[in-house]
Amino acid sequence: MGLKSYQKKVIADLTRYLELLNETKSDAAAFRLFWQEKSAPTLGLYQNVIPGVPNLCFKVPTGGGKTFIACNAVRPIFDALPATKTKAVVWLVPSDAILTQTAKALKDTSHPYRQKIDVDFGGRVEVYTKQELLNGQNFNPTAVTEQLSVMVLSYDSFRGRGKEVLKAYQENSNLAEFAKVLGKPDSPIEKADETALFQIINQLNPLVIVDESHHARSELSLEMLENFNPCFVLDLTATPKKESNIISYVDAVQLKNEHMVKLPVIVYNRDSQSEVLIDAIDL
């Protein structure tokens, strides 16, 4: 499955920003220059959500293929960042239903999402759920240095202090080898054991993809994002919040032109020409 023309534009926008980031070595300067090139300098005010961490947003309507766009964004992001021993992706989703759907698609080697990532990373890809990570199932220091590790996780299983969240903070003998290999963390998580899953992910310095990111703007959500110790944050949403650093917009008309969505035809009777003109301006 190839990218639609509007999806190609999103990836092109990302690629241009990454080029500017490498030239300027500044998240904010690259963002400002990007929108200056688009003749829209007023859009170039960068919101420093996590200091020192690039944070971008794709604004794509529901049904626009956000997940497939994100799959195509992983390789360009890693290519633009400094080389590291490990390549890890935390793919955050807002609900159990989306978690199941996303994990199933990314684990299926015949699915276009997984096929794209496999092509970009030479088939050396492993996709994990939280339980598989907690169990250390094919998740060890050797594996993560030889593959792209994609961890599909829900906000609620790492946000707050609930029973399910605490599992990620607790001592975990299944992951003890990581603590030996990775050593003391540079960014230790408060109240997390050095063998805890959350702390291990933190030390892998992952790319974090936030699906439906408008649900992840509370203080607890931002604390969660910081604890992941991301190298880059990519937000996906149809309804971005004001602090989002939107790098590419897709509107419903572009989806309609690509036959991705059918827009309804709504007809109203108006009593005068002036009312018609007023409604047209409002629309």
Where are these regions (language model features)?
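RecA-like P-loop NTPase motor core of helicase/translocase proteins
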Residues: M1-L283
